[in-house]
Amino acid sequence: MAELATIARPYAEALFKATTGAGVDPVSAAAWLDELAAIADRPELRQLAGNPKVTADQVFALFTQVLKDAARAALPEMAGNFLRTVIANGRINVLTQVAQQFRALLNRRNGFSDAVVYSAFPMDSAALSEVGAALQKRFGRKLNLAVQQDPSLIGGIRVVVGDEVLDSSVKARLEQMKAALTA
């Protein structure tokens, strides 16, 4: 999906520059951008937006109605303008990538990286903070940790930080032993 990422990059960069230039909190902008991306990921909405008989104003109204139904606050003016631009250009399908790239820009500015910790078993907060401290030392930067359970790992953890992977799972060790024995 490099093509979608290429299409999304200018939108993310422009929105990031606009939010920082206008004094808007980029964290709140990332939050409403995530909400818009979640709405845009709905297949029904994509189908409706792709219908040539449906106008851009109708698609925009649908987004705002979904936000109201979810008891969310009204979109800030900047968010509304951004959404109108995305809809007018027929780029609803890249909102998820725009949100990801916007977060990457925000993380880069703040010296953070997103990290996903895959664990075979649920992790309590004490274990997660211990793992987080070790990972921050290992990767040399602050990390925003997200935990996902993956029973296929058998034991241990697998950490993904950007394009770097640290795999200390039992599954990975078994695969290494299998490769060594069959070589």
Curated annotation (Swiss-Prot):
It comes from the Bacteria. It is a peripheral membrane protein. InterPro entries: ATP_synth_OSCP/delta_N_sf, ATPase_OSCP/dsu. Keywords: ATP synthesis, Cell inner membrane, Cell membrane, CF(1), Hydrogen ion transport, Ion transport, Membrane, Transport. It is found in: Cell inner membrane. One of its GO terms (molecular function) is proton-transporting ATP synthase activity, rotational mechanism. Signal peptide: none annotated. Pfam families: OSCP. Gene3D superfamilies: N-terminal domain of the delta subunit of the F1F0-ATP synthase. One of its GO terms (cellular component) is plasma membrane. Belongs to the ATPase delta chain family. F-type ATPases have 2 components, F(1) - the catalytic core - and F(0) - the membrane proton channel. F(1) has five subunits: alpha(3), beta(3), gamma(1), delta(1), epsilon(1). F(0) has three main subunits: a(1), b(2) and c(10-14). The alpha and beta chains form an alternating ring which encloses part of the gamma chain. F(1) is attached to F(0) by a central stalk formed by the gamma and epsilon chains, while a peripheral stalk is formed by the delta and b chains. F(1)F(0) ATP synthase produces ATP from ADP in the presence of a proton or sodium gradient. F-type ATPases consist of two structural domains, F(1) containing the extramembraneous catalytic core and F(0) containing the membrane proton channel, linked together by a central stalk and a peripheral stalk. During catalysis, ATP synthesis in the catalytic domain of F(1) is coupled via a rotary mechanism of the central stalk subunits to proton translocation. This protein is part of the stalk that links CF(0) to CF(1). It either transmits conformational changes from CF(0) to CF(1) or is implicated in proton conduction. This is ATP synthase subunit delta. It comes from Verminephrobacter eiseniae (strain EF01-2). The gene is atpH.
